[in-house]
Amino acid sequence: MQTKERIDYIKNWICDYCKSMPKEPDSLVIGISGGIDSSVTSAICALTEKKVIVLSMPIKQLKEQHKLSLQHQEWLKSKFKNVQSHLINLDEVFKSFEVSLSAFSNEHGFANSRARLRMTTLYQVAAANNGIVVGTGNKVEDFGVGFYTKYGDGGVDISPIADCKKSQIWQMGKELKILQNIIKAQPTDGLWDDGRDDASQLGMSYQELELAMEDKNSENYKKYLEIRKRNLHKMKPVPVCKMKNE
């Protein structure tokens, strides 16, 4: 599938899904991080001509990450009249959360809590606007290595780009003319004070992960399987205790 065709296909899929719902939503609600995935997803959503609400939700965010988020919001609004943007600073809410749970302090847990707080915010905004929450995860993250927060950025209503590889996301970004500084930025989940990028957390770049997913003979295939095994619980349905003979 060519890049433009892929964009149109995703756009039409979003429209068809909304029409298939018992009550068609009035809006599409998306969290904007300043990264390529959320930038591409929000731009494709805007192409549907439905009302699109994009949220920037900084929590102890690095200035450069937050700047990219705001720049994309402005770019999006300059291109599409159906886009609304909001800055919802969650710093104080998160600080209160950290204080309340100081007896249970855990760095990794608090990092994931940032994503879960953003998810809660997205759903509140969606509820107030008869909207649905649109996910921004790609195929490598969502179905390859499970690189997302359980019930955080993984908690969405639809996942339009979850069957697209990271390389395809970058191609769509270029086709959509997403800002160059976003296309060139190092991918990061934005959950850590030190601004660590995705590659440093995964131990591989997205290009290496894609190759490992597609080629069992690649040098990183074993490492890919190890990461996948660790995170498989995120990608599987919640285990249910089935009663015998019932």
Predicted regions and their residues:
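Conserved G/P- and acidic residue-centered "switch" motifs that form tight phosphate/ATP-binding loops
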Residues: G35
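ATP/NTP-dependent adenylation/nucleotidyl-transfer catalytic domains that generate, transfer
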Residues: Q2-I30, A43-I53, K60-Q61, H72, ...
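Phosphate-binding/switch loop-helix module in NTP-utilizing enzymes
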Residues: R118-L122
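Short, surface-exposed alpha-helical segments at coil->helix boundaries
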Residues: S38, S42, H66-L70
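Extended, folded domain segments that form the structural surfaces/walls around functional sites
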Residues: S38, M57-K60
